[in-house]
Swiss-Prot record:
Reactions that this protein is recorded to catalyse: dCTP + H2O + H(+) = dUTP + NH4(+)
HAMAP family: dCTP_deaminase
Coiled-coil regions listed: none
The protein's name: dCTP deaminase
Native organism taxonomy: Bacteria, Pseudomonadati, Pseudomonadota, Gammaproteobacteria, Lysobacterales
NCBIfam families: dCTP_deam
Active site: 138
Gene Ontology molecular function, alphabetical: dCTP deaminase activity; nucleotide binding
Family from the record: Belongs to the dCTP deaminase family.
Subunit structure: Homotrimer.
UniProt KW keywords: Hydrolase, Nucleotide metabolism, Nucleotide-binding
Annotated EC: 3.5.4.13
Job of this protein: Catalyzes the deamination of dCTP to dUTP.
Amino acid sequence: MSIKSDRWIKRMAEQHAMIEPFEPGQVKHDAAGQRIVSFGTSSYGYDVRCSREFKVFTNINSTIVDPKHFDPGSFVDIESDVCIIPPNSFALARTVEYFRIPRDTLVVCLGKSTYARCGIIVNVTPLEPEWEGHVTLEFSNTTPLPARIYANEGVAQMLFFQSDEVCETSYKDRGGKYQGQTGVTLPRT
């Protein structure tokens, strides 16, 4: 497996709609000229943005967190340009970008250093071959203070690894439970 360059990412996005919407360069300023957390194509990856759709975890129901029987009432839905995550808590969001992963490619997501250096960790499982959808992002606030996430700015970097052999069974072939997801998607079993 080898990591793919900006040239490959641009070609796959433009010719095969791998990423929509797609930004071929790095965007570092908003329309008013103010600095933002960058997004778009980098040398060996693609920096994604989160949408304005957030689900912030709350313990108001004092329930046990169980991935097999997750209570959707454990979240407060927020639509905003900014999301405040309570101390030692987490929020879910989704990417602005919709992904269509090629059959010979695996995508690994890493958090951006701007957030990591503030104690905000982004977690996403790998995007498997032939998976498609909006990526659900999990932000953990590891600090004892509230933390801010900005919508429509960079939050994580996707790294694309192309195998030297096409997989026998893709995510699509298996009928993966998160195939084609749109919006913030809660745990499924």
